[in-house]
Amino acid sequence: VNMMKAGDGNYYEMRNNAISDMLEPGSTFKTASIMVALEDGKITPHTEVDTGNGIMMMHGRPMKDHNWHRGGYGKIDVTRILEVSSNIGVSYLIDKHYSDNPQKFVDGLKRIGIDRPLHLQIAGEGKPNIRGPKERYFAKTTLPWMSIGYETQVPPLNILTFYNAIANNGTMVRPKFVKAAVKDGEVVRDFPTEVINPKICSDNTLTQIREILRKVVAEGLAKPAGSKQFAVAGKTGTAQISQGAAGYKAGRVNYLVSFCGYFPAEAPKYSC
């Protein structure tokens, strides 16, 4: 239920936030960035990055890890980078391997299909906005910040569709709200499963990503999303909400906090 307060003081269901909100996804987007780099052969799960004391200057702008005030994470590998959701780790790798050709990274995201319209059965769908280097305001800092889920807008359901594809052996399917239309006990119309992208990445990359996401919940920051009854895989997300033209520094600081994943991790049945 998405209830919003109207001018008359009453609350109404005006919009569906899950399909229409165009917010920066934050750290749930890091999985897509790492998937692109793995698929392109730029990194492995064991590739290391020295994140130092938690603050790294990138093109004149400080990139910070959430624990920078405690001294940072030092040298960690790709698996650990996602486990602790290191901004420096992800952004450094993407900037290192794609700064000379940002379009290749953008093409990798589009190859996954995370930007594709879902053509949902309900109205109000937002359109993902993933900018390319030829577009206006694509600066040197855009690539590293895009890699950690900023400077790009993707509706929550599109992010869930991506994680569902990881759970679904790499096949991205269109979210479905109606399975069939029934009249007088008889099915008058079926709504079959529709494939958006038959393969978001290679089997090898998919296996690596699934193992990393399992460890994110088992050993990383997503432990609270775990369960004693079954294994959960997924990724946490925290994004500072932009205050429009004022950017991220004006007034009160608000954050979008999320988790996206699936369970049981070894044989997924549900995405969340």
List the predicted regions and their residue ranges:
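Beta-lactam-recognizing serine transpeptidase/beta-lactamase-like catalytic domain environment
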Residues: 1-26, 32-271
